[in-house]
């Protein structure tokens, strides 16, 4: 009896229950960690995008960006080709300009050489057409010096005559005369002043460079009228102060003289 009790106590009869419980625990633990782990695979990302409305919008934007990228690549290629064409054109123009510069520079040199040759040939031709004198006499006598001196003297005389004629013509030409148009207000003493006599007295003032013009009577007030008269004067010959002094000398008729308007002509 005692032996049976000992054997039964050493056997764990409920061990399978604990094993099942432990297995279930670890299975639940592993399933929970797998569900919390993010899906990083391309298939899961594609399925997530296809299953959501935002994913379709993002896909459309990506497609548009790809199209824009392709169009930009095309534009860049066109620009590169245009730049290459311009560079080739510039190189061609530089080569052509370099080839033309020596030719253009050589043309003045050719002209100078032709002139020098002409100058050298002309005395030789004149010597060949000479009177046949000896070489020693030709060395002592200047055949062309006298002619050149006569030509220089003739040219100087003609130039002096032309300058003299120009100076005379310029001296005879009248210069610009500065003139002014003046409107004078001549005021009488009272309404009993004879305005016709007053105007007659004013017009008796005569000076070199003074020309009287039209006139009229302008009412002032209380039956009094003033004489408004126009005149043209040369600025260098007639001054306004002198003109006013000459008019105010007729003190029996003239009270004062004022300048109503002054204009340069």
From Swiss-Prot:
- Which intervals carry biased composition (Polar residues)? 31-54
A GO molecular-function term, please?
A: translation elongation factor activity
Chain segments carrying region Disordered: 31-64, 118-155
The GO annotation for biological process reads:
translational elongation
The stretch of residues making up the signal peptide is none
Entry coiled-coil feature ranges: none
> Which key words tag this protein in UniProt?
Elongation factor, Protein biosynthesis
Q: Which Pfam families match?
A: EF-1_beta_acid, EF1_GNE
Give any Gene Ontology cellular component.
eukaryotic translation elongation factor 1 complex
Biased-composition ranges, Acidic residues, are 130-153
Task: Outline what the protein does.
Answer: EF-1-beta and EF-1-delta stimulate the exchange of GDP bound to EF-1-alpha to GTP.
Q: Give the record's subunit note.
A: EF-1 is composed of 4 subunits: alpha, beta, delta, and gamma.
Family the UniProt entry places it in: Belongs to the EF-1-beta/EF-1-delta family.
Q: Which PANTHER family match?
A: EF-HAND AND COILED-COIL DOMAIN-CONTAINING FAMILY MEMBER (PTHR11595), ELONGATION FACTOR 1-DELTA (PTHR11595:SF26)
Question: What's the protein name?
Answer: Elongation factor 1-delta
As recorded in Swiss-Prot or TrEMBL, the protein's gene is named eef1d
């Amino acid at each position: 009896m005692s032996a049976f009790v000992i054997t039964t106590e050493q056997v764990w009869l409920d061990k399978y229950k604990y094993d099942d419980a432990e297995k279930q625990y670890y299975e639940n633990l592993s399933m929970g960690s797998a569900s919390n782990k993010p899906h990083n695979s391309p298939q899961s990302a594609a399925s997530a995008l296809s299953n959501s409305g935002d994913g379709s919008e993002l896909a459309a934007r990506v497609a548009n960006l790809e199209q824009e990228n392709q169009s930009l690549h095309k534009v860049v290629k066109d620009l590169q080709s245009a730049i290459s064409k311009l560079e080739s054109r510039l190189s061609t123009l530089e080569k052509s300009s370099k080839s033309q510069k020596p030719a253009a520079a050589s043309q003045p040199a050719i002209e100078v050489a032709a002139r020098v040759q002409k100058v050298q040939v002309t005395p030789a031709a004149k010597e060949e057409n000479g009177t046949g004198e000896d070489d020693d006499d030709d060395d002592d006598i200047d055949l062309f010096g006298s002619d050149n001196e006569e030509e220089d003297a003739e040219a100087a005389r003609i130039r002096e005559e032309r300058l003299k004629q120009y100076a005379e013509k310029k001296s005879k030409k009248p210069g610009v005369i500065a003139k002014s148009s003046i409107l004078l207000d001549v005021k009488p003493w009272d309404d009993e002043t004879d305005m016709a006599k007053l105007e007659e007295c004013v017009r008796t003032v005569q000076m070199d460079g003074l020309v009287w013009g039209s006139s009229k009577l302008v009412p002032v007030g209380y039956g009094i009228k003033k004489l408004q008269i126009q005149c043209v004067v040369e600025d260098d010959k007639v001054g306004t102060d002198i003109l006013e002094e000459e008019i105010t000398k007729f003190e029996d008729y003239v009270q004062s003289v004022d300048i109503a308007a002054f204009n340069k002509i």
